[in-house]
A protein has these predicted regions:
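Ligand-binding loop in jelly-roll beta-barrel domains
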Residues: 77-101
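Conserved short histidine dyad/triad with adjacent acidic residue
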Residues: 12, 28-42
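A cytosolic small-molecule/anion-sensing beta-strand core signal
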Residues: 52-53, 68, 87
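Short acidic-glycine-tyrosine-enriched beta hairpin
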Residues: 62-77
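Structural motif
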Residues: 48, 55-57, 64, 80, ...
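A short, N-terminal "cap"/entry segment at the start of jelly-roll beta-barrel domains
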Residues: 1-24, 104-114
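Short beta-strand segments in beta-sandwich/barrel cores
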Residues: 37-38, 54-59, 73
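Short, conserved beta-strand element in jelly-roll/cupin
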Residues: 31-33, 43-58
Length: 114
């Protein structure tokens, strides 16, 4: 992870930081406070969620799935999903194709710091 990659708040209690990206993949580390929620959303990228530590409820198309340390979950593109954390949680998220929206925000924040 490059030290210049900024930490960005996605929604209250949830931050992300770009770990790596390439032509066809994007990876980020998300940190979620206990009790935080990410509203239901969808995106065109496929996503793999890997729980590094903690416990959360991933709600996929209205169906809850409890995930904890070491669990992974695949999300197809455009599938509605949201998150409720059950404890402080760290997640490694991988997307394909890359999240160009997130990379653009990273670049904007870096430019504001200069």
């Amino acid at each position: 992870m490059k030290p210049e990659n900024p930490t960005i708040e996605i929604c209250p209690g949830i931050t992300r930081r770009t770990v790596a990206n390439g032509e066809t993949m994007y990876q980020m580390l998300a940190t979620l406070a206990s009790g935080s929620r990410m509203p239901e959303h969808s995106h065109s990228q496929e996503q793999i969620v890997h729980i590094l530590e903690g416990k959360m409820r991933l709600i996929v198309d209205g169906v809850p799935h409890e995930l904890s340390n070491g669990d992974s979950f695949y999300l197809a593109s455009n599938v509605p999903h949201g998150v409720e954390t059950l404890s402080a949680t760290r997640v490694l998220d991988t997307f394909s194709p890359p999240r160009k929206d997130y990379l653009a925000i990273d670049e904007k924040v870096r430019q504001e710091v200069l």
